[in-house]
Design a protein with these regions (language model features):
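Hydrophobic, aromatic-enriched alpha-helical segments typical of multi-pass transmembrane helices
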Residues: 1-228
């Protein structure tokens, strides 16, 4: 495929990924609860919503893989080794995303036990559900870390190659580095609460304009490939 085609694919993937993510947040709000027993009860009441969320998670995983390939194709002429590393990070993000539906399905099976089996509010079920919730959180943060590493690499290559406006590229680098620093701290339990929400705002301020730019303007040839 041509650079123009890959740029449009990447632009669409950025915006589609964000749109699906927002939809998941809206759907997830109805089944969110701090207590495990309450969470299982909500999942039982809104099982169809949980199933839709599972499908959307699979969609985001495929979108992440599509975005990884498109960004690699755009940036490989600037530095193939770094572009390959960025590709691996984003592919890893997508593959970890496939694990999330399995965890959700495990919780859903506990929330909606078959007739004749133990109820979801038994001590054993609650312990298992609590572990699955923690595992899901760890998996999400780990996938986000791979996303941040890959985003840092691709943003740097876009900046170095002058393929997009420098100001936008710098926002991408800064937003990505911020996540690279804070996400491991969140995984270790050293950062929590409002900070874990605010730290994503700079990334949104980068990816939404970038998606639109790639769709409308595309990317310039790498700086090293431009005539002097």
């Amino acid at each position: 495929m041509t650079r123009a085609t890959n740029a449009r694919i990447a632009g669409f993937a950025f915006l589609f990924y964000i749109a699906v993510g927002i939809t998941q947040m809206v759907l997830g709000a109805a089944i969110s609860a701090p207590e495990t027993a309450a969470r299982l009860a909500l999942m039982a009441q809104h099982a169809s919503r949980v199933q839709v969320e599972i499908l959307l998670t699979l969609v985001t995983s495929v979108t992440a893989l599509m975005l990884a390939v498109a960004l690699y194709a755009i940036t490989r002429d600037e530095d193939r080794d770094l572009a390959t590393l960025g590709l691996c990070c984003r592919v890893g993000e997508g593959m970890l995303g496939v694990i999330a539906p399995m965890i959700t399905l495990g919780l859903l099976s506990l929330a909606t036990p078959e007739v004749g089996t133990a109820a979801h509010d038994t001590p054993a079920a609650l312990v298992l559900a609590g572990f699955l919730r923690k595992l899901g959180g760890w998996n999400t943060i780990t996938a986000a870390m791979l996303f941040a590493f890959g985003s840092t690499i691709f943003s740097w290559l876009l900046l170095r190659g002058r393929m997009i406006p420098r100001s936008l590229a710098w926002v991408g680098v800064a937003a990505s580095v911020l996540l690279v620093v804070l996400l491991p701290l969140e995984l270790a339990g050293l950062v929590s609460g409002l900070v874990t929400k605010i730290m994503w705002l700079p990334m949104a301020a980068f990816e939404i304009p970038l998606g639109l730019w790639l769709l409308i303007k595309g990317v310039a040839p790498p700086a090293r490939g431009q005539p002097s």
